[in-house]
């Protein structure tokens, strides 16, 4: 047990060690090669009012007059000291921008993640329990349509229905106009959060529905389900009880592993609904060639995705304890294939791994 957790943590830590520098190098290279002038993107229409001397002074203040590789190593040296640099787009430290905008993105992605899991897994279980009947066909058709539908089309459809025609929900920002964060109530945040969460969660339910349905049908057609039916358990109770536990174990892993896609979808949702999170900051930094802010957001994204994968492995092993034993069982056959290993050594290895050796 302890060795399994140790191997898992070491594997994720090693992946983080090489993935963070690689992400930083690739992203900094792409930003440096982008045909965007950061000074012009920052000044905008007033660029004609700035002379060459002023433009050179701004570039020198931002360090843009130096080669890209020198700027990268300067950024890396400051990163080791805990300084992510200054954002060109917001004229503020990158760490300040991340701290101010990360809670809004976390609320959006967290609510969307939970809503997508509850709705997707519930509909997947219902489709498997009604296999071959009209609820199954209806849910499968809806999941396939949602899976291939563009996210921006879903967002615009919800805005047209709930914000324009019915006027039930707001379609912009996190608060009503003229209301500050100190004056706002929780229900005002909630009303502005409904449409972005609805868009982001529905977009992620399609693959989850199909996955849960397939896993549950495989369990219901297996020997364990036939054994339970012989003991008098009905198909509905079987699907909602042990079958759903079997399917939801892998569904948690699949859903947590899609956190990277969830962040990518949040960029689109925050842009369409003007939600003040990291997604909106990503678009502004990309269009303004704001390399320090893009690098800061990329590092946060990589850490969040790796933590999601780690949590997926932990929850999957907690739901299915066989996953904690499998890595040990896979080592024994490799030892048996070594001809120079003595039989006594193989027996000791099998005893230590608590696996019964074959005669």
For each feature predicted by the language model, list its residue ranges.
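Membrane-water interface segments at transmembrane-helix boundaries in multipass membrane proteins
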Residues: 141-206
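Short hydrophobic, aromatic-rich alpha-helical segments embedded in or entering the lipid bilayer
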Residues: 49-81, 273-285
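Alpha-helical transmembrane segments of integral membrane proteins
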Residues: 2-7, 20, 98-135, 151, ...
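Membrane-interfacial helix-loop-helix junctions in multi-pass membrane proteins
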Residues: 59-68, 85-90, 94, 176-193, ...
């Amino acid at each position: 047990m302890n060795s399994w957790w140790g191997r898992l943590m070491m594997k994720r830590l090693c992946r983080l060690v090489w993935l963070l520098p690689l992400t930083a190098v690739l992203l900094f290279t792409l930003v440096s090669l982008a045909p965007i002038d950061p000074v012009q993107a920052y000044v905008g229409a007033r660029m004609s009012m700035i002379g060459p001397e002023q433009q050179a002074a701004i570039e020198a203040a931002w360090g843009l007059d130096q080669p890209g590789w020198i700027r990268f190593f300067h950024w890396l040296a400051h990163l080791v000291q805990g300084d992510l640099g200054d954002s060109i787009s917001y004229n503020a430290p990158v760490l300040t921008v991340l701290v101010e905008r990360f809670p809004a993105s976390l609320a959006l992605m967290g609510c969307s993640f939970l809503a997508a899991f509850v709705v997707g897994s519930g509909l997947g279980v219902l489709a498997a329990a009604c296999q071959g009947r009209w609820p199954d066909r209806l849910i499968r058709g809806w999941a396939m349509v949602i899976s291939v539908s563009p996210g921006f089309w879903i967002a615009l459809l919800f805005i047209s229905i709930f914000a324009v025609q019915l006027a039930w929900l707001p379609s912009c920002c996190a608060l009503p106009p003229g209301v500050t964060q100190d004056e706002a109530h929780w229900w005002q945040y909630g009303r502005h959060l409904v449409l972005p969460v609805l868009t982001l969660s529905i977009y992620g339910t399609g693959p989850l529905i199909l996955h849960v349905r397939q896993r549950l049908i495989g369990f219901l057609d297996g020997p364990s389900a036939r054994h339970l039916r012989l003991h008098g358990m009905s198909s509905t109770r079987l699907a909602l009880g042990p079958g759903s536990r079997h399917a939801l174990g892998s569904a948690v892993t699949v859903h947590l592993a899609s956190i990277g896609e969830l962040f990518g979808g949040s960029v689109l949702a925050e842009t369409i609904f003007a939600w003040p999170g990291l997604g909106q900051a990503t678009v502004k930094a990309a269009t303004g060639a704001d390399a320090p802010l893009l690098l800061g957001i990329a590092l946060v994204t990589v850490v969040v995705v790796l933590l999601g994968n780690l949590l997926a492995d932990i929850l999957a092993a907690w739901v299915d304890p066989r996953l904690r034993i499998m890595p040990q069982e896979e080592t024994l056959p490799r030892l048996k294939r070594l001809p120079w290993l003595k039989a006594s050594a193989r027996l000791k290895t099998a005893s230590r791994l608590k696996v019964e050796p074959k005669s």
